[in-house]
Amino acid sequence: TRGGAYDVSGTGYQPEGDITLEGKTARLAQHGHLHALIEVVAVANDTHVAEEDGQWKVTGEPTEGALRTLSHKAGFDAETHERHASIPFESANKFMATLNTAPGGQRRILLKGAPDRLLDRCRQELGAAGELEPLDRAFWEAHIDALSAEGLRVLAAAAREVSASKDALALEDLEEDMVFLGLIGIIDPPR
């Protein structure tokens, strides 16, 4: 995020580990950038992670399971967001989108997927101080390249507020005016 590069410890789907920024534990309440990013990857997610017979298992896509585990480590409860509509992941689009109402009543479109596809749909980004700024595509592309060079699978997150009366979601709703929130690099284990 523009708020910094967070590190996440732990392995597998077990929700144990820390989220840190510059070596210090990062709590969602004090890190709005992190909260916004985790909200997207947790809520726009149809995979479940649960403990069965002492083992943490994923029901759904492994990458989505890693994102769900991240949200558990952060203490984020995706169940508090009511989903109204969704556009499932398709390989042609390379993203997933949902229309949700947050606990505070804000209705948002949440979008996660391939960074290049999301960058194409954003004109603004969440700035370092939490304000909206013009999208700096070169900045994000450099970070995408750096994460990819480390062998990580890179995903991006974006969102935007919509009218409280909006109850449907179409591809046209994602064409532009999304706000870019940041990137996530995931260790992609060999298959």
Enumerate the predicted regions with their spans.
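Conserved cytosolic headpiece of P-type ATPases
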Residues: 1-191
